[in-house]
């Protein structure tokens, strides 16, 4: 996110949505927090199983990427070589399956 090339934005979104759906806000008990951290680590491990890492610069290692704040021009070529859509699909699929198997108590 923000071209810092740290945790993949798709993974960050997956973790934030899991927090919204399964978190208890400010009233996390120690046990709740432990369970939530397990959930996030499970989702991260499943993403890593498909792509080897959740780190953006490692996911994009075949591309010449920088961490400057100026975005690249969004050209047809940019979208042809950019693998980010694949990572968004993976994260969405993992979260969809997790939600289906573990319906949140809203």
Predicted feature descriptions by range:
Residues 2-5, 31-34, 38, 82:
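A short glycine-/small-residue-rich loop at the edge of a beta-strand within enzyme catalytic domains
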Residues 20-39, 103:
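Phosphate-handling active-site elements
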Residues 1-22:
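Small-residue-enriched, tightly packed secondary-structure blocks
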Residues 36-106:
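C-terminal binding/interaction regions
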Residues 3-5, 10, 30, 51, ...:
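Long, compositionally biased, intrinsically disordered segments
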């Amino acid at each position: 996110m923000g071209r810092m090339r740290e945790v993949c934005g798709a993974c960050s979104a997956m973790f934030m949505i899991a927090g919204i759906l399964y978190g208890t806000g400010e009233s996390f008990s120690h046990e709740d927090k432990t369970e939530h951290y397990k959930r996030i680590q499970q989702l991260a491990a499943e993403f890593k199983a498909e792509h080897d890492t959740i780190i953006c610069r490692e996911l994009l290692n075949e591309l010449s990427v920088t961490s400057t704040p100026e975005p690249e021009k969004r050209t047809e070529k940019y979208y042809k070589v950019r693998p980010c859509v694949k990572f968004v699909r993976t994260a969405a699929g993992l979260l969809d399956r997790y939600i289906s198997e573990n319906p949140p108590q809203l």
